[in-house]
A protein has these predicted regions:
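The substrate-binding groove and active-site-proximal loops of carbohydrate-active enzymes
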Residues: 49-59, 82-87, 126-136, 155-162, ...
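Ser/Thr-rich, Pro/Gly/Ala-heavy low-complexity intrinsically disordered linkers and tails
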Residues: 1, 21-37
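C-terminal motif of bacterial Sec signal peptides marking the signal peptidase cleavage site
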Residues: 16-17
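Sec-dependent signal peptide recognition
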Residues: 1-9
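Metal-dependent polysaccharide deacetylase catalytic core of the NodB/CE4 family, i.e.
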Residues: 77-169, 189-193, 242-249, 274, ...
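C-terminal domain-boundary segment and adjacent tail
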Residues: 73-76, 182-189, 249-333
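Active-site beta->alpha N-cap acidic-glycine motif
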Residues: 36-104, 242-245, 250-252, 260, ...
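Active-site-adjacent pocket scaffolds in enzyme catalytic domains
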Residues: 117, 154-261
Length: 507
């Protein structure tokens, strides 16, 4: 009996021990799976474009961003409010500290300084030279940033495109302002977060959201909310950062956009502003309740991570400061193997071009290739490089001379050279990139060759070009713009700045 009891007790202990081990292993597997899921789930930013500065205070538009912000604060959620400078100044002039303080508990960014007032950003930049446009944007949008910081107590971490207000000069100006660009027309496959014009860009507004005209009516809102079960997985799959456009606060109440006042280039003064038709005030209670339901729904999903663009700037805003011999050689081989201006995951084509030129220039003087170099970030060329070179072949000495001239031009101008000339003809930036790649690989392995063929090469990177150009051209269709707005120069400038394009990596 004693032996039987002992055996039973031992068996029980063994079973308990095995069960505990099994439970511990299952728990570890669950935690690993949860961690892996968290690693792959996309970041989603709840966005609000706070715009209407034309409607009178009596229309109640100012109250809507307040209750949107308060609702999120109550729920422990957050988002990014992009505020037009003129709207912020309007709230300040009306004494609406309550609205300002409610939004200031969240991320506040710029939605351009003057919004739909003509000339818009695009109209201002329509025919502006690159550097001229950058300086204009630094003045105009820098002043808007200053006002937003003074009013909300936080410096904008990003500026979000307002309607069709775009220009690569604006994006480049933001690089000098230390801010990101949101709702950008620029992206790469699988990457909504990219570097373009030396600025962190976040593409698009997502393929969902836009509940503006549905919040006030359950019959409209309910099917849109239910559709998110399929739309969110489909619209976020394989992406890094996605904008969920919550609403234009004023459009929650108004039936038409407030800036119909400015359509087709019209520029009325305050005495001529018309108030858009409004939904009944009592419908705003339904709108507020449905907005809460939307936030609850988004919070309940375990396949996305709600965040802000300010947090995303921190997450994606770091990039390598140096490049070493092995990495540069790897990119040079890709350029030659693929026969195109390649976009590396860590280094833009402009950064690669600058590094190759600097390395060869150093070799020409010192006889050695630097083991590691500081990463320089020039802008793309100011004019389209020729695809066909005017020179069929150069000597090794000429290749090193061209590299030295390119290196000096970048240092002085801050741009890649469009082309460099020899006595018999000129060589475009793409062909120079290929030439420098081959010469660099040779000097890394021993010495420069006696001569090099100069090959035709694309004038800029072409990855995702068609999609980017289409989005830029579509900016002309914004109803606020003049009907004769010409996007030709801005499209071309965007193509040339694709030399600065690369994925942004979470670090």
């Amino acid at each position: 009996m004693k032996l039987t009891t002992t055996l039973l007790l031992s068996s029980s202990i063994l079973l308990v021990h095995c069960s505990a081990d099994k439970a511990e292993k299952v728990d570890k597997v669950d935690k690993v799976e949860e961690a892996a899921k968290a690693e792959t789930r996309p970041y989603v930013v709840l966005c609000f474009d706070v715009e209407d500065y034309t409607s009178p205070e009596s229309a109640g538009m100012d109250d809507i961003p307040k209750w949107l912000a308060e609702t999120m604060s109550e729920m422990g959620a957050t988002g990014s409010f992009f505020v037009i400078g003129e709207k912020a100044r309007s709230l300040e002039a009306r004494g609406r500290r309550d609205v300002i303080e409610a939004m200031a508990r969240h991320d506040v960014g710029s939605h351009t300084n003057f919004g739909s007032i003509h000339p818009t950003v695009t109209e201002t930049l329509e025919h502006a030279a690159f550097d001229e446009g950058v300086e204009t944007m630094l003045d105009n949008e820098g002043a808007g940033f200053d006002d937003l910081e003074r009013i909300f107590g936080q410096r904008p971490a990003a500026l979000a495109r307002h309607g069709g207000s775009y220009g690569p000069q604006l994006v480049a100006a933001l690089s000098k302002m230390g801010a990101a660009y949101v709702y950008s027309p620029v992206s790469l496959p699988g990457h909504n977060a990219v570097w373009f014009a030396n600025t962190l860009n976040f593409h698009g507004e997502g393929d969902f959201g836009f509940f503006d005209d549905a919040y006030h009516d359950d019959a409209l809102f309910d099917p849109m909310l239910a559709a998110l079960d399929e739309k969110i997985p489909a619209g976020t799959r394989g992406l890094d950062v996605v904008a969920f456009f919550a609403n234009h606060p004023s459009k929650v109440r108004s039936i038409e956009f407030w800036d119909f006042n400015y359509y087709k280039g019209a520029n009325p003064g305050p005495d001529e502003w018309k108030t858009p038709e409004l939904r009944p005030l009592e419908s705003m209670e339904t709108a507020r309740r449905n907005f809460r339901r939307l936030v609850e729904y988004l919070q309940s999903r375990d396949d996305i991570e709600l965040t802000t663009y300010r947090a995303m700037v921190e997450r994606f805003g770091r990039q390598p400061d140096t490049i070493d011999t092995a990495r540069l050689a790897e990119i040079a081989r890709r350029i030659l193997d693929e026969g195109e201006v390649v976009i590396d995951p860590d280094y833009s084509p402009a950064e690669t071009f600058a590094a190759l030129a600097a390395a060869l220039a150093a070799y020409a003087v010192e006889g050695l290739v630097p083991g590691e170099m500081e990463c320089r970030r020039p802008f793309g060329p100011l004019q389209r490089p020729p695809r066909e070179p005017g020179v069929a072949e150069v000597t090794g000495a000429e290749a090193l001379e061209l590299a030295g001239r390119a290196d000096a031009a970048i240092a002085v101008d801050g741009h890649l050279p469009r082309a460099l000339s020899l006595e018999v003809g000129e060589i475009g930036a793409g062909s120079l990139l290929a030439l420098f790649s081959q010469a660099y690989l040779d000097v890394v392995e021993g010495s420069v060759a006696d001569s090099y063929a100069v090959v035709p090469f694309d004038p800029h990177p072409t990855e995702n070009e068609a999609a980017i150009v289409e989005e830029v051209r579509n900016c002309q269709e914004w109803p606020v713009h003049r009907e004769d707005l010409d996007m030709t120069d801005l499209v071309e400038m965007t193509r040339l700045q694709m030399w600065t394009l690369k994925p942004a990596v979470a670090r």
